[in-house]
Design a protein with these regions (language model features):
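Topological signature of polytopic alpha-helical transporters
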Residues: 1-4, 27-30, 47-48, 65-91, ...
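Catalytic Walker B motif of ABC-type/P-loop ATPase nucleotide-binding domains
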Residues: 131-135
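Helix N-cap at the start of a conserved alpha-helix in ABC-type nucleotide-binding domains
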Residues: 142-144
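Short, conserved post-Walker A segment of ABC-type ATPase nucleotide-binding domains
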Residues: 9-21, 122
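Conserved ABC transporter NBD signature motif
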Residues: 17, 24-42, 102-103
Length: 352
């Protein structure tokens, strides 16, 4: 959590190897075991802030396509469909499973909350132990946002680690988080439970009022106000320095120092070797190129047959292209040579 420009998305992208253009120091590790981008991709899922779907597909058809191209090839088709059913029930998508996803301004489809849950469902299919979510409540009203976070909370209670950036959560949503990381100017202002955050800021003489949303209060407290930049930055430095000297900050520093020799821990771990030597060397693609081709062909056919006008337009386009090709090349023999540049341009004008 943090105000705009605090570094939330930058940190999330750094953790997931998505900002290779910037200089990053340090090491990424899971349970004390160092990982690379390929290993992390096989262990985690990333839910983008913007939802990208084929609007003519139904919710079920979209999930079936995802199961065909993203699940392990050793899993039979019947088991994949069972997993699709489980995910539909888990993400409460049963009522809209046969509804088209829709395209804003063009095709009426499912609601914003259902679309966001469908994004989670697409990633949960492979049952990843870690999930990264970039602004999962963006563009949703408070009720829909609470429903989305409730889904994330239920997944966390089943053993998954959910890491997300969030902007201006309601007090109900804020209370659902197990841990919060407050950021300001790229620094850690606080890391711990919501109750510990209240006690920490109370110790600084900035106790959150009883009738105030804690999330809004902390974000405003750490924001950089225009025309008051210098004073705000001094205040932010004071809060961040105070956290480093606090009990939680000292514990965090100790954990970091104990995890310094990550390579040694990996050698002592029986499953760390598997992560580094096995998973890291696997292909990033679950399905073969032929399986991907079949799945994409099936998806394209579903999309086209649901739009009769599109079929007519593409048929007309094909006929026009065929006639143009016939007109350009039909009068020449295969053995003829091109004698001039103008003739070459004339023959190839269809491709311009």
């Amino acid at each position: 959590m943090g105000s705009s420009g605090a570094g939330k998305t930058t940190l999330l992208n750094t953790l997931t190897f998505r900002n290779n253009g910037n200089i990053v120091s340090g090491q990424r590790a899971v349970n004390g075991i160092p990982i690379n981008s390929t290993t992390l991709s096989s262990l985690s899922a990333y839910v983008q802030q913007d939802d990208l779907f084929i609007g003519t597909l139904t919710v079920r058809e979209h999930l079936v396509f995802q199961a065909l191209v993203r699940m392990d090839p050793q899993i039979p088709y019947s088991q994949r469909m069972i997993r699709v059913e489980e995910v539909i029930k888990e993400l409460t998508l049963s009522k809209c499973q046969h509804t088209v996803i829709g395209t804003p301004g063009r095709i009426k489809g499912i609601s914003g909350g259902e679309m966001k849950r469908l994004s989670f469902a697409s990633e949960v299919l492979t049952n990843p132990p870690v999930m990264f979510c970039d602004e999962p409540t963006s563009g949703l009203d408070s009720f829909m946002a609470q429903n989305v976070v409730t889904v994330l909370k239920s997944m966390a209670l089943k053993g998954k680690t959910i890491i997300c950036t969030i902007h201006q959560p309601s007090s109900e949503v804020y209370a659902m988080f197990d841990k919060i990381l407050l950021m300001a100017e790229g620094r850690v202002a606080f890391l711990g439970s919501p109750d510990d955050a209240f006690n920490f800021f109370k110790g600084l003489g900035a106790s959150c009022p009883s009738n105030y949303n804690p999330a809004d209060y902390y974000i405003q407290l750490l924001a950089i106000v225009p025309t008051q930049e210098e004073a705000c930055r001094d205040h932010v430095d004071m809060v961040c320095d105070s956290f480093e000297r606090s009990e939680q900050g000292i514990k965090l520093t100790a954990v970091t120092e104990l995890s310094g020799d990550l390579q040694a821990k990996a050698m002592l771990s029986s499953w760390g070797e598997t992560w580094q030597g096995g998973v890291a060397n696997r292909s990033p693609y679950k399905a073969s190129w032929w399986a991907q081709f079949e799945a994409v062909l099936w998806r394209s056919w579903l999309s086209i047959k649901k739009e009769p006008v599109l079929i007519k337009v593409r048929l007309l386009q094909t006929l026009v292209s065929m006639m143009e090709t016939l007109f350009s090349f039909g009068q020449y023999k295969l053995t003829e040579e091109i004698s001039s540049l103008s003739e070459l341009c004339h023959r190839g004008r269809i491709f311009q």
